[in-house]
């Protein structure tokens, strides 16, 4: 995407290089430390990638189904790490098959390859969308990028897939079905893009996605057997109960449910509030589609809506927010003053970095609703999206009057 204006900070290659250098240094340090401390130890720092590696190791041992049983998974995690942690495994079997292959490598190497390659994929997707404004996107998303590097989570992968899907969809390519199908690893994050494919009647892309999903479901069935699906469904039911009981770290979740539940509302009421919010988010998306929003605004709307569909959304899933920002940053900068840009950046960092900062400052134990810190990520994120939408209304009006220097985007 090319644009007829520039911004010294948002297009600064020096800032981009500095941010990515910090991420690379953190990645290298973590990979080395995880490899050096691979032996079980009660003093070990355990992150999300350890859960990937333990689930994959169980798969290598022919016990993939045990990963979905919380009691067996906790025993395995303590055996392999030396630390008793609460990290239920609820990923679909296709991702279990993936981490099984990953676990064939040494821990540090597996972590380094997974995080390094998915980060590169994510940055590539952002670059293709934002163009010269990539530095601004990376600066705004720095808390999420550093968090995802440290934890070894898959936010870069899902964010990159959604970004590549939206690019291919805007170019009317059937290959949009490839990233759509690969989102089978986290189907709750694919609701928005699947809905967009459906209303746009992109049948070829949906056919490609269906073929990929069928293959992705068949492979773990062949490798692990049909029993893997029974174990998976049992694990999902169990994790739903854990979510209702408040056993997950709600303060690191971005959903409306997490905020409502952490304030003391009952699970049923919190789920009802979240469900209403999710329907409203999808309704706004459909409204934007019916009003024929410009493609880049519609793409950003999909990303925003996706963040509020599932009650089980963590801070590392906010990589999707970066994709949405990449689509609108040029217009946002053009239609906002410097003071507004600083305020929006502060809100970006507050909304995306709250869980990370809280974990470091308070180091809370996961002991249940009412004892953990409040989940305060959804409110600033909703405010951020609302403020960006208001600013972008100025862009829409300017485009309609023919005064915007933004180059046209291919129609959906």
Identify the role of each PLM range.
Residues 190-191, 317:
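Short, well-ordered alpha-helical microsegments
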Residues 330-412:
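Aromatic-enriched
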Residues 95, 191-192:
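Residue-level signal for cytosolic alpha-helical hairpin/rod architecture
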Residues 185-188, 215-219, 343, 347-354:
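Membrane-embedded alpha-helical segments of transport systems
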Residues 178-182:
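Transmembrane beta-strand segments that form the barrel wall of outer-membrane beta-barrel proteins
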Residues 1-176, 197-322, 329, 371, ...:
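Primarily membrane-embedded glycan-assembly and transfer machineries that use lipid-linked glycans
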Residues 143, 183-185, 193:
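Long, hydrophobic, well-ordered secondary-structure blocks that form the structural core
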């Amino acid at each position: 995407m090319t644009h007829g204006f520039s911004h010294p900070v948002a297009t600064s290659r020096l800032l981009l290089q500095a941010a990515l250098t910090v991420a690379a240094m953190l990645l290298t340090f973590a990979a080395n430390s995880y490899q050096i401390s691979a032996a079980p130890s009660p003093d070990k720092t355990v992150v999300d990638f350890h859960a990937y590696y333990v689930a994959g190791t169980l798969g290598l041992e022919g016990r993939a189904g045990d990963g979905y049983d919380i009691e067996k998974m906790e025993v395995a995690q303590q055996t392999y790490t030396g630390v008793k942690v609460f990290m239920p495994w609820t990923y679909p079997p296709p991702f279990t098959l993936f981490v099984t292959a990953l676990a064939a490598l040494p821990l540090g190497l597996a972590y380094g390859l997974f995080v390094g390659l998915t980060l590169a994929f994510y940055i590539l997707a952002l670059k293709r969308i934002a163009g010269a404004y990539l530095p601004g996107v990376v600066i705004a998303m720095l808390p999420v990028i550093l968090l995802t590097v440290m934890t070894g989570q898959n936010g870069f992968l899902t964010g990159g897939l959604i970004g590549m899907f939206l690019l291919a969809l805007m170019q009317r390519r059937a290959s949009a079905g490839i990233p759509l199908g690969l989102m089978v690893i986290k189907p709750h994050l694919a609701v928005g893009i699947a809905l967009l494919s459906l209303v746009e009647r992109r049948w070829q892309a949906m056919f490609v996605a269906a073929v990929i999903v069928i293959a992705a479901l068949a492979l773990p069935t062949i490798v692990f057997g049909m029993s893997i699906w029974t174990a998976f469904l049992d694990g999902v039911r169990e994790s739903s109960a854990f979510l209702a009981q408040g056993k997950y770290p709600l303060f690191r979740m971005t959903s409306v449910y997490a905020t409502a539940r952490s304030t003391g509302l009952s699970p049923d009421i919190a789920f009802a509030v979240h469900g209403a919010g999710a329907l409203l988010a999808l309704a706004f998306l459909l409204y934007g589609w019916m009003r024929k929003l410009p493609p880049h605004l519609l793409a950003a709307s999909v990303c925003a809506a996706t963040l509020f569909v599932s009650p089980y959304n963590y801070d590392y899933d906010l990589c999707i927010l970066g994709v949405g920002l990449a689509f609108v940053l040029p217009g946002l900068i053009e239609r906002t003053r410097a003071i507004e840009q600083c305020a929006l950046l502060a809100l970006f960092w507050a909304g995306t970095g709250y869980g990370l900062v809280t974990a470091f400052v308070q180091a809370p134990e996961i002991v249940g609703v009412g004892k953990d810190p409040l989940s305060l990520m959804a409110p600033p994120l909703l405010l951020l999206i609302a403020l960006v939408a208001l600013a972008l209304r100025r862009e829409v009006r300017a485009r309609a009057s023919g005064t915007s220097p933004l180059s046209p985007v291919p129609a959906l």
